[in-house]
Every structure is written in C-alpha cells, then in structure tokens.
Amino acid sequence: MLTAILLVSLLLPASALAKGAFGYARASSQLEHDSRPARYQPLNMVDGRAATSWCEGARGDGVGQRIVVGFQAPVSIDEVRVTNGEASSRQAFKANNRVRVLTLSNELARHTVTLSDTQRPQEIKLGKPLEGERFVVEIQEVFRGEGEANATCLTDVVFVSGGKPLSGPSLAGKLGDRNGAVALMGSWYSGLEGAPERFLDLYFDKTFRYRYQPFDPEEPGEEIRGEFAFDGKQLRLKPSGKEWVEASAALKAEESKDGLPRARLVIAAERLDGSLARSWSDRP
C-alpha cells in the first residue's frame, strides 16, 4: 500500500535530470557496535546487500529517525525497493524493530509508504516521481521486535529511476567506513538558519562540491569542486587546480530551534579561504 501526499509539484526539464551518481547517506543516528563501528552505518542501507543494514540508535523505538540520501546530480525517482528490518538472519529480523510506515520526501513533495513485516524485498512504485538531488527516508511507525535493544532497522532502500537502480548492488564493496569519513559525508549548510546561502556536499567517492548562492541577484555566485581526505582526525582538501590543504575539522552535536538534533562541522585552515573554512550545519 502506498499513499502519496503531494505538497508542491516540482518539475525539472528532462535535460536537467541527469543519471546522477550516488553521493552519500547520512543518518540522524546509528546503533553503536563496539567491535565493528561500521556495523550499522547508514551506507549499509543503500548497498543492496541482505548481510548489512542501518539500525538507528536513538532513545525510543526509532520513530522520527531518518536517513538523508544524496546524489551528485538531479535524478528522478519513480520506484524504491525496500528490504525491511535487519535481514541478515531470521533471528536478527525478529529481534529488532522493523518499519511499518516510512515517508520518502524531497524539499517539496512526500510519499507515505506502508510496508509489510517480511524479510523479502518490497517494490514500491511512486505514483508521481520525486526529483532532485537530496531525499529523506523517515521512520513513522514500527513493528516491535522481540529483543531488548528496541532499535529499528532497514536493510535496504534502493532508489530506482526508469527501472535502473541508482543505488544497490553496484555500490557493494565500495562503501566501507572510509576511515571515519562517513561522519562527514552529506550536505552541509552555512548562513542564516532556514535560509542558507552556502552549501557544501561531501561525497562517498572522496569528492566535494561547494556552492555560494547569494540572495542578492547583483552579487556573483561561486562553485568549487575538488577532492577531500579524512583519516578520522585530519581533514585535507584539494580544490580543483590547486594543491592539497591541511585543515582541522571539529564535529559536534547541538540542538536547533525546533528542538531536533543537528550536527555542526567547523572547518579551519590557514591556507584555506573563507568559502570553505567556516562553521557548517547538517540542517538548512
């Protein structure tokens, strides 16, 4: 069963809808695993493998927890293929919570999806495609597991465009922990809360894109692309055509005005201009 709630129609020209490469998956929380830090990381939800899953790690049953999935160019999503729960084994599936209802949204539209309580993959056709670069998968209701952890898990949400998976098995083997870089991957925003003018995307393939989009039409914008590396402590950036620059990256959690958690990334470097060296938030 699929219930689609259309808030505003977003129509992009067909020429603008590139087959965007997968960019990142960023979660509001993940279940900690002492011996394997990447065991329940958000990238597991897009690799198309039953042996891996994302499990949220917030207090409660997981309702309201989310994963933001980003692409490196605009895409049109007309189908998702969902494998519910922790599907690596029947025991793990029954022990952990599964998702009963989730929402899939972009900035302007939202679909509500009701799932079955099964380990088998479920194909969900979207009545109206979602278009853009950034999509949010959010847990709305759960099937309660038999274990004590009370963690809700999703094994896979594969995004499909015109019958072609844009995430899934093609990414298997490419989505390791990245030496802690998974904590930085995602879209970051700088400027007034709710009205940012600067955007920084850090992708799983170790590339980045920075954009300055001023509200003043008389002021020129800016775009910088390049590479980044992060070993869990030291951040290095290489804007296209320039040398590598060492920077510090401080990541911390804080609360926003609406009471929901947000992450704050502060990048500082002597040889990096103010475009990139500033304070960033993972929420607009």
Q: What is each PLM-predicted segment?
A:
Residues 75-93:
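A short beta-strand element within beta-rich, extracytoplasmic domains
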Residues 2-13:
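Bacterial N-terminal signal peptides
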Residues 65, 75-78, 100-102, 198, ...:
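Short beta-strand/loop motifs in extracellular/secreted proteins, especially
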Residues 62-64, 72-81, 132-133:
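Extended extracellular/luminal ectodomain segments enriched in beta-structured repeat modules
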Residues 61-64, 88-168:
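Trp- and acidic/polar-enriched beta-sheet ligand-binding modules for extracellular glycan
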Residues 16-72, 90, 94, 163-186:
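Disordered, acidic Ser/Thr/Pro-rich linker "stalks" and the adjacent N-terminal cap
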Residues 137, 157, 165-223, 234-284:
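Lipid interaction determinants
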